[in-house]
UniProtKB/Swiss-Prot annotation:
Glycans are attached at residues 189, 284. Residues 307-319 have a biased composition (Polar residues). Binds 1 copper ion per subunit. It comes from Neurospora crassa (strain ATCC 24698 / 74-OR23-1A / CBS 708.71 / DSM 1257 / FGSC 987). This is AA9 family lytic polysaccharide monooxygenase C.
Amino acid sequence: MKTGSILAALVASASAHTIFQKVSVNGADQGQLKGIRAPANNNPVTDVMSSDIICNAVTMKDSNVLTVPAGAKVGHFWGHEIGGAAGPNDADNPIAASHKGPIMVYLAKVDNAATTGTSGLKWFKVAEAGLSNGKWAVDDLIANNGWSYFDMPTCIAPGQYLMRAELIALHNAGSQAGAQFYIGCAQINVTGGGSASPSNTVSFPGAYSASDPGILINIYGGSGKTDNGGKPYQIPGPALFTCPAGGSGGSSPAPATTASTPKPTSASAPKPVSTTASTPKPTNGSGSGTGAAHSTKCGGSKPAATTKASNPQPTNGGNSAVRAAALYGQCGGKGWTGPTSCASGTCKFSNDWYSQCLP
């Protein structure tokens, strides 16, 4: 299927949130949906034991396999809808600012990335970022206009892999199944590299439990601040893979700085109404552990700072106070000044700070 047909099918069904849709390699944009296994819409996965937790509910699969040299700076781009923003004043692109949480990247070695299935694969984590100095990985993604970066480990064996990018939104994670998982997989071929064979692999489903401290968690401190109450945040999943001494591997996105990086392209298909969200306050859940939002490199070196993408940053606009909220959008809560009715679904109370349009 041609990319244009994929775009039309995906954009027509998109409604809210975010979707992984592009890869860059050493600053070179690989193209919209090239090498990407794409879901039918940008809705989250909420069941950690569902098969959708692997690569999402894939309905479109591109045949390209992207070449990634070992040690390359790899970017993964997220947008509210395929192509990025839902419109010129889409304040929720690349994702609603209320959707705080971590970002991770996993790899699984495969024989043929274009045709392999996703069940039974062994995954190892090559990048992670959580909460650091009051800022979440999602905050840096938004500041970077949808791009997040990591360094491909220099020591992993050459060959084909599935690359699983994941963003977890924790704004409503105080109750079980409240965390929202946004996931996508890319098909890559690593060139160069070494012979390291990661031992700390995990399976999906199975790597996460619904009660893990980084998944069932109240991230709100005093006055509704999203600082996890000043406590460290424990990133879900296995320990970050690192190369033996002398090689580099395992990294985390750094704070955004201004530079020139790949620019997402816009889809020509019509866009649905965007979802407006703001900071809710769940009433239960807990967070503990030792969070890790810094880079991990063997040999003591640090990854390059994340750079700011050149695609335009949408501005907050529109008359949200008079329009209905989209499915999964916020429709109430203390201090909420946006829509209080739902274009689809029913406005359901979650806690004093957050009500949401649900099916």
